[in-house]
């Protein structure tokens, strides 16, 4: 009968890998370590301004001057945008019970006060935990500049 054509023929060009041996098996190019390498200063400033950064111009200038430095790329990976706390987070939502508001107004006042106190203590401890032994975003940039 013979051998099927799919076994005998060469693979299509799109399946042939021209990558180096260590990259075989991957179907795409390696990513750049520094995403700002070919960006213009104005583009970088706009990016920082849209994220709400107060020092957008200074930060953009530092990034633009050090675009090829691998330490800048590492600092950019560590940089995270600070988000304001969400007001209606699911752990802070509270549905009032129907019987408690009319039956005992003193008890509902006590419950509300204790839940507010608990919410404040959770926020404070979360803030302390988040900032514990961790420099701010400016620390990363100053660390690589000096």
UniProtKB/Swiss-Prot annotation:
Source superkingdom: Eukaryota
Region (Disordered): 1-31, 80-146
Keyword Cell cycle: yes
InterPro entries registered for this protein in UniProt: AVPI1, Avpi1/C8orf4_dom
Pfam family, one: TC1
GO biological process, one term: positive regulation of MAPK cascade
Biased composition (Basic residues): 80-92
Spans traversing the lipid bilayer: none
Keyword Cell cycle appears in the UniProt entry: yes
Biased composition (Polar residues): 106-123
Record keywords, A-Z: Cell cycle
Function: May be involved in MAP kinase activation, epithelial sodium channel (ENaC) down-regulation and cell cycling.
Matching PANTHER family: ARGININE VASOPRESSIN-INDUCED PROTEIN 1 (PTHR14350)
Protein's recorded name: Arginine vasopressin-induced protein 1
Gene: Avpi1
